[in-house]
Structure formats: C-alpha cells, structure tokens
A protein has these predicted regions:
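Hydrophobic anchor residue at the start of the ABC signature
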Residues: 145
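Catalytic Walker B motif of ABC-type/P-loop ATPase nucleotide-binding domains
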Residues: 156-159
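H-loop/switch region of ABC-family ATPase nucleotide-binding domains
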Residues: 192-193
C-alpha cells in the first residue's frame, strides 16, 4: 500500500493494513487557523465496499475528502492501496456555462475508445449532444459520474452527488453508483445528508463530528439509531415513523 503522509506524520503500525484494504486512516487530524476541524479520525475501507460519511454541517466531512485527496495539510496517516486510481464527483461543476457539448466535455478526458467509455456509463446520445448548461441537475450529475469513471478508477469519492437534484432524479443516480460497485468492484466513499440513501446503499457508515461518532456495518444500525448518534435523541424518528415517509 502507498503512504500519503501529512506534514506531521504520527506513528503507524503497518500490520494494521491488510491486502483487502483499499484505505486505512489512522489518527487523522486537521487544523485551520488553530481551530480543530478533525481529530483522531481512524477507519478502514475494504476493497469493493461502500462507505457513507455522515454528520452535522461543519462536522468535517468535506475536510476529510480534501485530506484524502491530499489537498490540505494534516497529521496522522492516510494509507491507500497500491492499486488506487481515484475518481472524484463534486457536488457540481464550478461553472456549467462552458460553451461545449457533453460529448466534447467527456472526449477531453476519454481520449481513446470513446464509444466504450460512454457505453460503460450509460449516457444516451441525446444527452451527449446537449450543451452542459442545458442539462438538468440529475443529467449533470450523471455526466459528472461519467467524467469520474472514464479512467477506470478503483475508488470513487462522491461529495453529496445529488445536492440540488430533484427527488425523483436521486434514485437513478444512486442505482448507477451501486451498479458500479457490484459490476466492476469499485470502492465508494460517499458524503450524504440523506439518511434514506445511507441506509439503503451503504455497506458501512462513518459518522463524524470532528471526531468519529460511529464507524461500523450499516446493518448494525437502525435509521433511528443513526440519527440519534449524529444529532441526539430529540431528532430520532421511531422506526414506524421512518417507514411511513
């Protein structure tokens, strides 16, 4: 596995890493202007599994992604498997006013065997011909997923992939993400505020509020228990109320 140390790397035992691990994070810490953003964050992600990262606003979820992408300084250890090839799906493009079609946008990245690239992500010809700025929120997210996976990544990082997307368009996006995991074994890390999505699509859950509140198998939690862990008991629905939604 490959080490991506922070500027102040703490002690780390290599025996913690196994060949089946895509990612091992140990004692991760991030500070900004002497303010603690993340503290003593440790978890593992197995190859071919999905991890949902949840927590209150300001809890450090996006900061964690920035550290995993080596975009900010941190302490502790981030250890990726040697096979790692990362794809990143942001909440949105910085600008959707680019005067180009979806096909031109994707060809910029997929320079060989374009037809195979497009087939793998399931984009229809009518979407390929549209301009980026004409796309709906759901269509744009599908294009961003396509952009992320045309290089055959082994890991995909999703930062609120359905933020700003109509409710009816959310499920097809997550179905596509789930199929990538099942069909080609991509490891998925997903930031989401949507507990319904977390409880239906994630294998494991990491709840963050600067520190780790919970890390474990999603099946070990009910929806109500997860809400209680993150927000306190007053926000937890009963299981009956949840299933009525």
């Amino acid at each position: 596995m490959s080490d991506i140390p922070g500027p102040e790397t703490s002690s780390y035992n290599d025996s913690q890493a196994e060949i089946s691990d895509m990612l091992v994070v140990s004692e991760l810490g991030v500070k900004s202007q002497n303010k603690t953003i993340l503290e003593e964050v440790s978890f593992k992600v197995k190859k071919g599994t999905s991890l949902a990262i949840v927590g209150p606003n300001g809890g450090g979820k996006t900061t964690l992604f920035r550290a995993l992408l080596n975009l900010i300084p941190y302490t502790g250890m981030i250890k990726w498997n040697d096979e790692v090839r990362m794809g990143y799906v942001p909440q949105s493009l910085v600008s959707t006013d680019l005067p180009i079609s979806v096909e031109e946008f994707l060809r910029f990245k997929c320079k060989t065997d374009f037809d195979s690239c497009i087939k793998s992500v399931g984009l229809e010809n009518d979407i390929l011909r549209q301009s980026l700025k004409s796309l709906s929120g759901g269509e744009l997210q599908r294009v961003l997923i396509a952009w992320a996976i045309v290089d055959n990544p082994t890991v995909l990082l999703f930062d609120e992939p359905t933020s700003g997307v109509d409710i009816g368009a959310e499920e097809p996006i997550y179905d596509k993400v789930n199929s990538l995991k099942k069909e080609i074994g991509i490891t998925i890390l997903l930031i989401s505020h949507n507990m319904h999505v977390v409880m239906h699509y994630a294998d494991y859950v990491l709840a963050l509020d600067k520190k780790v509140l919970f890390f474990g198998d999603r099946k070990s939690l009910t929806h109500s228990q997860l809400l209680s862990i993150i927000y306190g008991n007053e926000f937890a629905l009963s299981e009956e109320e949840f299933h009525k939604e």
